[in-house]
Amino acid sequence: GCEIIRGNGFSKLKTIGGRDHAEVAIILQKRWEDEQGNVHALRVGTGIERITSDVPDWVNGHRIPVHYGDISGESWYKDYMKLLNGTPMDLHCINSKGKNVKIVEEGWADENETPNVLIIRFLASCGEAFYGGVGNTLWIDNVKLIM
């Protein structure tokens, strides 16, 4: 990953420090909408991989495992796998009233819960808007879902 800079178009580029990385995420949610139009979700499944080193050759057949239920206590759990609430990566959707609303990811679902939403996210930069590494590149081709 490249060094993180901030560039919003209104000021000079500023070096922030740290490294920016590509990320691939598969998130399964169980969503519902309340009477006020707020959209809520439980995290059913999580498969997130940060690509923290250069991969010079094309990789065929790469797999990202999806883990079900509450994974926060697992030894391999990383902070970037957390629920998306109050983070720069919060998700939004159009509710039944036609408004763009933030999705409130309230907790972890039981591992046997049936999801009703699949999110697949490919990011060349895993930081918030206007922060990133100049030169980060992520090539994606032929995505396949295996059930």
Enumerate the language-model features and the residues they cover.
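Extracellular-facing segments of soluble proteins and assemblies that are Gly/Ser/Thr-biased and enriched
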Residues: G1-D34
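Residues that flank catalytic or metal-binding motifs in active/ligand-binding sites
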Residues: D20-V24, N60, V134-D141
